[in-house]
Amino acid sequence: MACGATLKRTLDFDPLLSPASPKRRRCAPLSAPASAAASPAAATAAAAASAAAASPQKYLRMEPSPFGDVSSRLTTEQILYNIKQEYKRMQKRRHLEASFQQADPGCTSDSQPHAFLISGPASPGTSSATSSPLKKEQPLFTLRQVGMICERLLKEREEKVREEYEEILNTKLAEQYDAFVKFTHDQIMRRYGEQPASYVS
């Protein structure tokens, strides 16, 4: 009898001792809604706190700089080529002005200072007509030196533009960040400001 009662007792309590008990299955769904049934005010406050913890510098670090992959940057060869082309255009312009002055010797007096500036002052023994702009001039810089000067000027200009861009971007990000924080605070106060405080919130 004792053995029979013992066996019967174990069979009766078998569902309770099993890991997959029906009572545990009934209680399991209740814990999930309880954790998910938090107050919307707490969720909104947590979102506002996480947003307040961020800063415009964080978004600036996440976004890659638009100056990183600039494909239109001039190389040294392109700078030298542009200088050569500009020098050729200047020579052609001077040649045309010299031929125009030779073809029309009776030019007006107002065009003479312009020719004087281009060709330079005439020597005491020669007249202004004989001092041609095509005269051999001694250059102050070589082509390589001019290219280096232009490259340095372009680099300085690029750095200045980059600094101005970063400053403007930081200012705009700070303004957007302040507007977002103010909007979130206004929404929280409008939705939950007049409600009485409870243990849930």
From Swiss-Prot:
InterPro entries: Akirin (IPR024132). A motif (SYVS motif) lies at residues 198-201. A motif (Nuclear localization signal) lies at residues 23-28. It is found in: Nucleus; Cytoplasm; Membrane. GO terms for molecular function: enzyme binding; identical protein binding; protein-macromolecule adaptor activity. It comes from the Eukaryota. CDD domains: akirin-2. One of its GO terms (cellular component) is transcription repressor complex. Disruption phenotype: Mice are embryonic lethal. Null mutant embryos could not be detected even on embryonic day 9.5. Conditional deletion in macrophages impairs proinflammatory cytokine production in response to Listeria infection and clearance of infecting bacteria. Conditional deletion in B-cells causes a decrease in the splenic B-cell numbers, leading to severe proliferation and activation defects in B-cells. The B-cell viability is also impaired, leading to decreased immune responses to T-dependent and T-independent antigens. Keywords: Adaptive immunity, Cytoplasm, Developmental protein, Immunity, Innate immunity, Membrane, Nucleus, Phosphoprotein, Protein transport, Repressor, Transcription, Transcription regulation, Transport, Ubl conjugation. Polyubiquitinated. Polyubiquitination is dependent of UBR5 that extends pre-ubiquitinated AKIRIN2. One of its GO terms (biological process) is positive regulation of interleukin-6 production. Its main location: nucleus. The modification Phosphoserine is found at S18, S21, S55. Homodimer. Interacts with IPO9; the interaction is direct. Associates with 20S and 26S proteasomes. Interacts with SMARCD1; promoting SWI/SNF complex recruitment. Interacts with NFKBIZ. Interacts with YWHAB. Belongs to the akirin family. PANTHER family: AKIRIN-2 (PTHR13293:SF8), AKIRIN-RELATED (PTHR13293). Molecular adapter that acts as a bridge between a variety of multiprotein complexes, and which is involved in embryonic development, immunity, myogenesis and brain development. Plays a key role in nuclear protein degradation by promoting import of proteasomes into the nucleus: directly binds to fully assembled 20S proteasomes at one end and to nuclear import receptor IPO9 at the other end, bridging them together and mediating the import of pre-assembled proteasome complexes through the nuclear pore. 'Akiraka ni suru' means 'making things clear' in Japanese. The name is given based on the presence of the clear nuclear localization signal. This is Akirin-2.
